[in-house]
A protein has these predicted regions:
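Short periplasmic/luminal acceptor-recognition loop of GT-C membrane glycosyltransferases, typified by
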Residues: 228-330, 341-370, 392-407
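Alpha-helix capping and helix-loop boundary segments enriched in small/acidic/polar residues
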Residues: 2-9, 23, 175-178, 259-263
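Aromatic-anchored segments of alpha-helical transmembrane domains
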Residues: 16-20, 82-90, 159-171, 227-235
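Transmembrane catalytic cores of multi-pass membrane glycosyltransferases
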Residues: 8-9, 17-158
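Alpha-helical transmembrane segments of integral membrane proteins
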Residues: 23, 27, 185-192, 224
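Signature aromatic-anchored transmembrane alpha helix within multi-pass, membrane-resident enzymes
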Residues: 83, 204-245
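Transmembrane alpha-helical segments
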Residues: 1-3, 14, 32-40, 44, ...
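Membrane-helix boundary/interfacial segments in multi-pass membrane proteins
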Residues: 100-127, 155-217, 243-245
Length: 408
């Protein structure tokens, strides 16, 4: 006897829970796909019952709920497992929401590049010929085998789910948001490429049998498969060209570029961190820093007062109000006014500021949401007059192009 699919249900629940911990979009799409699979399974059982009733009128029939219950029970188990794992990450946020701290702003879905306004058809995209051919082969295999192969059915439903999500994403654009369907294109490519691998194996077997099983056919097929894999492997740098360029030209946390050229201002981050910890006398996880150079926080995990853009900000942080508060600080007239404003900030005020210098003033590059434009953010600069920090309450240190201001 088999386990009746319970092993798969537990594994799927664990997968969904882990995806909820790392990438919400993929989690929601995965849940949508699993539910769609359940609906297809239920509809198939119902259709089979209907066919039996037509050909065998006296045969016993199960009701709609009796057909649905085993599927629904497995979905419930998956949901419980996924929820338990997801709460490891989501519990603090949900606790805040449930106690009345509702999100003031949430623009995570406000992004509509050109690729998000059309359906993706990787099987007809031959800018990367091998990937396109593999996806096309996968599409053909799904059409041919969807009625007889569980693997094909699972992959086909997943592909259909992505296309349905893409259509829904286009539809909700009218409501001022999106489903970020363009982010699912890599998943679509993986699904079709996996189907293409199955199609190649089964197609080669079918040809082998059709030509009377010649002795050297298997060897020839293996050679073609190996050469195809090598060719595809060699094309990966072309597919990842932008990412590879960034890897070689970006300055790392040690102030070094992989291409050995002069590093960017990031090379000063180590010194900034050293001075900041010395002057605050506190560990990083007890310090709030306001800076527009948020990559600094990637290397040194201080708490940031403001995110780079609203799309990546915690919805509970009220990104627009924080931006307005920062702008208000720049318009104050004296250090005493600034100190008072910081002491009465609606949120925990910055313990330090990391600026760029502009003459006698200090600048921050902030951003605001301008969806549905592409790019979806507008960058703007705010200037703090240097005179606002001319007080013993502030300790000022120039480091490279940066100015670090630490509150006493």
């Amino acid at each position: 006897r088999t386990a009746g699919g319970w092993g798969a249900a537990i594994g799927a629940g664990a997968f969904l829970g882990l995806s909820a911990m790392f990438y919400t979009l993929f989690f929601v799409v995965a849940v949508f796909t699993v539910v769609l699979m359940g609906l297809v399974a239920w509809a198939t059982l119902w259709w089979q019952q209907r066919e039996i009733a037509v050909h065998q009128p006296r045969a016993p029939r199960l009701g709609v709920f009796r057909l649905l219950w085993p599927i629904l029970l497995r979905l419930i188990v998956m949901g419980v497992i996924a929820a338990i794992l997801a709460l490891i990450v989501w519990a603090p946020y949900l606790a805040k929401v449930l106690t009345g701290h509702l999100p003031e702003s949430n623009t995570a879905l406000h992004y509509l590049p050109e690729s998000g306004s059309r359906l993706a058809f990787p099987m007809f995209d031959f800018s990367e010929p091998l990937l396109g051919a593999l996806c096309l082969l996968g599409t053909l295999w799904l059409v041919v085998r969807v009625a007889s192969s569980r693997r094909a059915q699972a992959l086909a439903i997943s592909v259909v789910a992505i296309y349905l999500w893409s259509l829904a994403s286009m539809l909700v654009t009218a409501a001022g948001t999106t489903g970020l369907a363009f982010r699912l294109e890599p998943i679509l490519q993986v699904l079709l490429a996996a189907a293409g691998a199955f199609g190649f194996v089964e197609g080669a077997r079918a040809v082998y049998q059709a030509v009377d099983e010649p002795r050297r056919f298997r060897a020839a097929t293996a050679v073609v498969a190996v050469l195809g894999a090598l060719a595809f492997t060699q094309s990966i740098p072309g597919i990842l060209n932008a990412e590879i360029t960034t890897a070689y030209t970006d300055t790392d946390g040690n102030g070094v570029r992989a291409d050995k050229r002069s590093p960017s201002a990031v090379s000063h981050y180590g010194r900034i961190d050293q001075v900041l910890t010395e002057q605050t006398g506190r560990p990083r996880d007890e310090t709030v820093l306001l800076t527009a150079d948020t990559s600094f926080l990637s290397y040194y995990p201080y708490f940031g007062f403001q995110a780079l853009t609203s799309h990546y900000a915690n919805p509970l942080a009220d990104f627009p109000a924080r931006a307005a508060e920062i702008k208000r600080w720049t318009e104050l007239k004296s250090p005493a006014e600034l100190i008072d404003a910081l002491n009465h900030s609606p949120w925990r005020a910055p313990d330090a500021f990391l600026f760029r210098r502009s003459g006698e003033n200090y600048t921050l590059r902030l951003a605001e949401d301008v969806y549905p434009n592409d790019p979806n953010v507008r960058r703007y600069t705010v200037e703090f007059p240097g005179t606002l920090f001319a007080d013993p309450h502030f300790r000022i240190t120039d480091i490279g192009p940066f100015t670090l201001v630490v509150r006493s």
